[in-house]
Amino acid sequence: MEEILTELMEQEKQAVEKYKDVSKKVRSSTERDLIDRILAQKKFEIETLKLLCSGNVPDRFIAFGTIIEDEVNFRDSPSPSGSLTAVLGRGTPVILTERRGNWVGLQLYDGKHGWIFRDYVRANE
């Protein structure tokens, strides 16, 4: 299965490059908007294929996301008193798995689970 997923991922990456070329040639903002939506969907497909290849598929899934602050405490529970398990940097790709109040449950691509305050992550469209 991994071989097929890898092949699909390469096809999607090639498609993204072609859509980027098309984006440079569009004439209207509506056309640009439509191409941007396709590119966002392709990015989601590529991230999904990476996740499937990793073997670390979470039991729950809300969205793919990105850490948007420089040093974000990754805790073992949704509380400021939860044990610190790691510090995440800006741009770290994550998987949003659940929400509890002001906290978001995450899974890292290496399979680690934890929690961060919701203001420090952005869900990808």
Which residue ranges define each predicted feature?
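Alpha-helical scaffold segments that form or flank carboxylate-/histidine-based iron centers
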Residues: 1-5, 29-44
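Alpha-helical bundle segments that constitute or directly flank the non-heme di-iron/ferroxidase center
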Residues: 1-26
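Alpha-helical transition-metal enzyme core signature, strongest for iron centers
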Residues: 11-19, 35-49
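Alpha-helical coiled-coil oligomerization motifs
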Residues: 24, 31, 50-57, 61
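SH3-family beta-barrel domains
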Residues: 54-76, 86-90, 97-100, 118-125
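Short, solvent-exposed loop/turn positions at domain surfaces
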Residues: 79-82
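SH3/SH3-like beta-barrel fold
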Residues: 91, 104-108, 116
